[in-house]
Structure formats: structure tokens, C-alpha cells
Amino acid sequence: MGLSEAEWQLVLHVWAKVEADLSGHGQEILIRLFKGHPETLEKFDKFKHLKSEAEMKASEDLKKHGHTVLTALGGILKKKGHHEAELKPLAQSHATKHKIPIKYLEFISDAIIHVLHSRHPSDFGADAQAAMTKALELFRKDIAAKYKELGFHG
């Protein structure tokens, strides 16, 4: 399940492009998540009232949350699989406070892949997509293990 150094380099190369606009990427990813899987919106009291894509695009709170999500994910990706310290508090909050099912992390992973491909097609070809998919699967597998330790089977 681990990634090779070459795969991590592909992941981190495209992630550098994401970091140039964390808020914009994050907002677009969350909008794609909420539009594709409206049930996920119910986990966010702050965003439940946002019904249209236009409302979502106008929401500064959504943009800020997108920035927060991608900042955390970037910190995890940069650890190249050695993300225990970063993952623990994230798993704790997502399992016990927010109660986010692993399935929702799959949904956001799909949204991430889609947005990166649409925004950075020349930097996110098949090899980079495969590497990012693998990195996100590793993240989900490890967070699922933490969920289990915490007694959350979401």
C-alpha cells in the first residue's frame, strides 16, 4: 500500500500547485463534494443553509473551511506516509466530535482527484492521478484504523 519515492514526488509536485491557492481549491473541492453527495452537507451545521452552488461560491466560511481541510491534508501528504502525529488529532475530532464516516472521506478523495485533474491537467496525468489516489487511500486506511481504536465504526 505504501508509495514509492517517485510516487510521493508526483503527489507533492501537484500539491505545490494546490498550495498556491488553498482556499480556491478547497472551496471547489467542498462544492463538488456537497453537490455530488448532498448528505455530506448535513455534517456541517455552518453550511447546511447553503443550497445552491452560487451560495456556496459566495460563502467566505466555506472558503475558509476549504483552506483548513487542504492545509491539514497537505501536512499529512508531506509526511509521505509517516503521518501518525498528524493523523491522531484529525481522527479523534472526525470520529468523536464530527462523526464523519469513512465513506465521506472516499467522497472527498474523489472530489480532490477531479478538481486537481480539471485545474492542473498538465501536472496531473495518469501517473500523478494514480499516485494521489494511492496516497489518499493510505490516508483513509490509516484514519479508519484510528477510528476503530476510538470505537467509531463510521
From Swiss-Prot:
The modification Phosphoserine is found at S4. GO terms for cellular component: extracellular exosome; sarcoplasm. GO terms for molecular function: heme binding; metal ion binding; nitrite reductase activity; oxygen binding; oxygen carrier activity; peroxidase activity. The modification Phosphothreonine is found at T68. The keyword rRNA-binding does not apply. It catalyses: Fe(III)-heme b-[protein] + nitric oxide + H2O = Fe(II)-heme b-[protein] + nitrite + 2 H(+); H2O2 + AH2 = A + 2 H2O. It holds the Pfam family Globin. InterPro entries: Globin, Globin-like_sf, Myoglobin. Nitrite binds at H65. Keywords: Cytoplasm, Heme, Iron, Metal-binding, Muscle protein, Oxidoreductase, Oxygen transport, Phosphoprotein, Transport. It is found in: Cytoplasm, Sarcoplasm. Residues 2-148 form the Globin domain. The keyword Oxidoreductase applies. Heme b binds at H94. Its EC number is 1.7.-.-, 1.11.1.-. O2 binds at H65. One of its GO terms (biological process) is removal of superoxide radicals. It is an enzyme of class 1 (oxidoreductase). It comes from the Eukaryota. Monomeric heme protein which primary function is to store oxygen and facilitate its diffusion within muscle tissues. Reversibly binds oxygen through a pentacoordinated heme iron and enables its timely and efficient release as needed during periods of heightened demand. Depending on the oxidative conditions of tissues and cells, and in addition to its ability to bind oxygen, it also has a nitrite reductase activity whereby it regulates the production of bioactive nitric oxide. Belongs to the globin family. Monomeric. This is Myoglobin. It comes from Ziphius cavirostris (Cuvier's beaked whale).
